């Protein structure tokens, strides 16, 4: 890919800011004699600001008065540069990636998704799908290009022009040390390159962290041996503070992963029970929230650490917080929300692993009592604890939609997943949530070990039975994650053989073979064959399933009742038989 994009280096240009919410005013830097630059590398969708750096900035500047922390969203900067380069002709994207889309059409994307274009973000669904698809495609093309360019670079060779500009921008900050915070695996190659070059060219310390380091952190350091002085596994606040106090020495730093005498050393992480001690609202003062690719700012907030369930057999997400679940007090949550609403932010994504029904009820009560007037979305598991009265409180507190972990419509598969859910309970929760004015987005999975075609058809039947109360289907094919319960004990799940297909920085991509059920290829083909049906669930636009923050703003702006009134046209879903023959589904249309 690096050879297919034609880039010519140009002077750095910032994307013009839009009017609207003003950036939070920074804490005065007087008295701060040292600077830590926290970098969020490209490339991922830029609809909202990165949370990790803002949380660390607030904590470190409170705890270490001599340190000034600057947060640099290199991801957002990268999008601004890409569109500037398209505009001046120094970047050309081959037709095979963008089809017959003109450069002029592509250049309309930022204004549209920021709510500034002539087409209405909230009313023109066709325009939303068109520009949303262009943004998603551009993200994939540029992201793959940068990842390959970063991995292919050798010392002494010229850097990719965009990466060279990024390093020039970073160098201009004259920081005393650097942190790189990453969430998504596609950020890893660029982050590793930045760390490597910064260490070589400046001699300064470079620290890595972020929720992508859930497993395989030691493998990452072997894969990219010169990328970082220390990687922090787990909560970042106290380890980063200690690293700064010790001039980068990892001695005694919990969760530190580093080289020592030619070996990778992994200090065991520690998890502070009282997360209120980490402070209040994240400090977004270095970031203009109005510059993000949404009509109004949507701020991510983390109200807890870890997962209260921690038993899903396919999952490793909770591992970044260890086997813990720690909640902010409701008093601290309301304090954080008050701070953010005082800065003009009223839309939030609660990015907790998931919120339990009892805690959700208390959280909703606290938000209602505080009279905050916010809107938000969150993740949860549709258990029978979500009674109508709890869902009613959630809606009254500003919950516009929930991403529910449904996963399957087959009880046998749910039990193998150890989800702790029942098919009939999930249906009731979804119907009750809809009745109370909450939009339902659901996750489903195809190809769990030993799942048969008939069992995945059960999932499709589940969706069909409940499609009048479902607004979006987020779907994927099962992937074997290193460190997951299935990976550790495959025989228990009918997995006869596992093997590494492609080595990667975080432990490889793995395949598996089961004694029964679909192969991964069969599951992929089956899921692909029903995509037209699944895409029809969103009442407004297909791409709303891709941009979560945009879905929140749409529901807040137009209301759930208006969404219900929109017509939806479901094609008769068809699926592939084992022989590859398309068959109509034996399911009634309603």
PLM regions: where:
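Structural recognition of alpha->loop->beta junctions
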Residues: 220-242, 393-402, 458-480
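Conserved Radical SAM active-site core
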Residues: 77-87, 91-175, 225, 317-375, ...
């Amino acid at each position: 890919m690096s050879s297919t994009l034609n880039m010519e280096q140009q002077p750095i240009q910032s994307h013009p800011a839009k009017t609207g919410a003003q950036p939070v005013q920074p804490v005065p830097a007087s008295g701060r004699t040292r600077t830590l630059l926290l970098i969020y590398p490209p490339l991922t969708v830029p609809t909202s600001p990165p949370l990790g750096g803002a949380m660390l900035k607030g904590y470190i500047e409170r705890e270490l008065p001599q340190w000034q922390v600057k947060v640099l969203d290199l991801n957002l900067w990268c999008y601004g540069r890409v569109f500037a380069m398209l505009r001046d002709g120094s970047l050309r994207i081959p037709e095979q990636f963008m089809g017959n889309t003109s450069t002029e059409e592509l250049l309309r994307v930022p204004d549209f998704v920021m709510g500034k274009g002539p087409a209405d973000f909230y009313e023109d669904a066709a325009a939303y799908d068109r520009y949303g698809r262009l943004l998603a495609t551009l993200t994939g093309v540029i992201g793959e290009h940068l990842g390959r360019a970063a991995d292919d670079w050798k010392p002494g060779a010229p850097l990719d022009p965009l990466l060279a500009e990024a390093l020039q921008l970073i160098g201009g900050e004259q920081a005393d040390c650097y942190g790189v915070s990453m969430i998504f695996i596609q950020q890893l190659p660029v982050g590793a390159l930045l760390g490597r070059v910064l260490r070589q060219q400046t001699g300064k310390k470079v620290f890595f962290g972020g929720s992508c380091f859930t497993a395989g952190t030691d493998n990452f350091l072997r894969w990219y041996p010169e990328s970082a002085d220390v990687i922090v596994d787990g909560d970042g606040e106290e380890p980063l503070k200690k690293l700064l106090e010790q001039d980068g020495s990892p001695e005694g730093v919990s969760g530190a992963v580093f080289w020592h005498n030619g070996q990778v050393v992994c200090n065991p992480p520690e998890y502070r029970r009282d997360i209120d001690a980490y402070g209040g609202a994240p400090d977004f003062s270095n970031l203009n929230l109005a510059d993000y690719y949404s009509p109004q700012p949507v701020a991510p907030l983390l109200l807890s650490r870890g997962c209260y369930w921690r038993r899903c057999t396919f999952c490793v997400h909770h591992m970044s917080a260890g086997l813990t679940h720690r909640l902010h007090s409701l008093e601290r949550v309301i304090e954080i929300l008050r701070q953010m609403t005082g800065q003009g932010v009223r839309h939030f994504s609660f990015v907790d692993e998931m919120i339990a029904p009892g805690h959700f009820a208390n959280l909703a009560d606290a938000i209602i009592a505080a009279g905050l007037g916010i809107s938000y979305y969150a993740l949860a598991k549709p258990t029978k604890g979500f009674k109508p009265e709890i869902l009613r409180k959630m809606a009254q507190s500003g919950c516009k939609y929930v991403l529910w972990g449904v996963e399957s419509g087959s009880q046998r598969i749910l039990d193998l997943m150890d989800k702790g859910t029942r098919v009939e309970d999930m249906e009731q929760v979804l119907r009750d949530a809809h009745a109370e004015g909450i939009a339902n987005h659901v996750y489903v999975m195809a190809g769990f070990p030993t799942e048969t075609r008939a069992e995945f058809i059960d999932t499709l039947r589940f969706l069909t039975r409940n499609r009048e109360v479902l607004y979006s289907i987020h779907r994927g094919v099962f992937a074997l994650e290193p460190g997951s319960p299935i990976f550790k004990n495959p025989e228990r799940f009918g997995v006869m053989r596992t093997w590494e297909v492609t080595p990667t920085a975080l432990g490889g991509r793995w395949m598996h073979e089961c004694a029964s059920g679909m192969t991964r290829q069969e599951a992929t083909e089956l899921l692909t064959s029903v995509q037209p049906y699944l895409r029809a669930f969103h009442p407004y636009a297909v791409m709303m399933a891709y941009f979560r923050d945009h879905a929140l703003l749409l529901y807040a702006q137009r209301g759930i009742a208006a969404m219900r009134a929109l017509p939806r046209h479901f094609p008769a879903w068809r699926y592939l038989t084992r022989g590859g023959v398309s068959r109509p589904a034996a399911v009634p249309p309603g």
